[in-house]
Amino acid sequence: MLLKTKICRKADIGMKKRLSLILCVVLLCQLLSGCGKTTETVREPDDAYRCYYEIFVGSFCDSDGDKCGDLSGITEKLDYIEDMGFTGIWLTPIMPSPTYHKYDATDYYGIDPSFGTMEDFETLLKECHKRNIRLIMDLVFNHTSSSHPWFLEACDYLEQLGEKEPDENECKYVNYYNFAKDQAQTPNWYQIGSSDWYYEGVFWDGMPDLNLNSEAVREELEQVASFWLEKGADGFRLDAAKEYYTGYAEKNIEVLNWFETYVKSVKPEAYLVAEVWEGQGVLQEYYKSGIDSLFNFPASQQDGAIIKTAKARVTPQQFFSWMVKQQTADRLANPDYIDAPFISNHDTTRISAQCVNNEEQMKFAAGLMMMMPGSPFVYYGEELGMKSSGTKDENKRLPMYWSAQDLSKTPDAPQTADAVEQKFPSAEEQEKDSGSILQYYKNAIELRRSNPEIARGSISVPDGELPEDIGVLLTEWEGKVLSLIHISE
């Protein structure tokens, strides 16, 4: 299967970078008048539109030989990240936590010792900003760890309370979580010792849910946000936003609006993207919160629009028409929204599994994503075609495949991960191969960044019937870009 993508700019039409195998950028003079070759370079605006690289910190790069990925390891690999063309990094949680994934903090103001020190984080930020790479942090405030001091103190208080009613004057943390009696038969509620008290934990008993009705909790979270923004963080990825009040979208939207308003009052240029694992209709409602971005789950994963198109289950023009419909709906909810398309992340199977190791489909999918408006997110190792295995989370978070020979920078896999043999070559090998998946991603990102209309523009599809192997998309933003997809065997 061959994919050809042709791009012309109204004010700057010319031959663009040739992409290997299935993404070819060629002159499109027959479609637009006045096309002429040019060598002018398009400068990418320094704004919130970025190409993000998601890093699962413990699995990325080990700087000190302890076989755990760390912050200094990321700093060491910034040249690789910059060379790929990424202009933003999303770090999965780095705060102290008893679990390998760190999605349950015991301290919102620290760095997990396995990842390094606060000085290491500050160095990483400094080096990112030198390269004009923005860094956003994963912020988990649906819940904490059951080992968090707030929770431990509240539980200790309730166990000793007897028949009295809780009093915040005696223990301020008793209102930080969702505590109640008579919940023995209620799903996701867990008993505190042998007392009559229970607490809510939507994900599991080790992650007690915070009470976001509490003004004290919100003040705590505002202080947390201020702390990291003042350190230099460029924004946050908000975990599990639809579980703040499980089953109550309006309340969740209010929380997002409160947090977005507060963060922008501290740092107006900060960027927020939230995880709301839902379909298009629900996402449109959540955009009414005013948040910058929501991850585009309808585009992602095996049954998402990108992979369906890559597998020829829908036509290119159907894909483009879907994109237009989605942008129109989301802009009605939030005219300033920034889409956040992705193919895979730390909770999903990797692209290699979605495409059953079909290299052309994987490249096609990457090319499609890089033609979508907004800020695309690429999961570390996706640019290599790294494998996952089955549905076990640990298998989705395997060590970055830097080299087949030199394993000095390769962390150990999560403890319960299965042994998975990678099908495609390491980063070291793919960097030397002009036809590799890595080079395809790199070229696709370069194409996107050299045509800023793609990320920022208003999109439409021209009228008229097209053959099933052709798709045409018009993007308008300070000029015009016409993208044409042609698929052939």
Summary of predicted features, one role per range:
Residues 35-218, 230, 241-289:
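Acidic/aromatic-lined carbohydrate-recognition and catalytic surfaces
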Residues 23, 27-31:
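Hydrophobic core
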Residues 86, 233, 374-375:
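A structural motif
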Residues 2-4, 9-21:
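Positively charged n-region of N-terminal signal peptides that target proteins for export
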Residues 266, 278, 324, 336, ...:
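Loop/helix patches that line or flank the sugar-binding groove of alpha-linked glycan CAZymes
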Residues 485-489:
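Residue-level detector of conserved catalytic or cofactor/ligand-binding positions
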Residues 125-129, 142-143, 148-168, 224, ...:
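Active-site-proximal helices and loops of the catalytic beta/alpha 8
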Residues 52-54, 88-92, 137, 237, ...:
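Structural recognition of the beta-strand scaffold that forms the well-ordered cores
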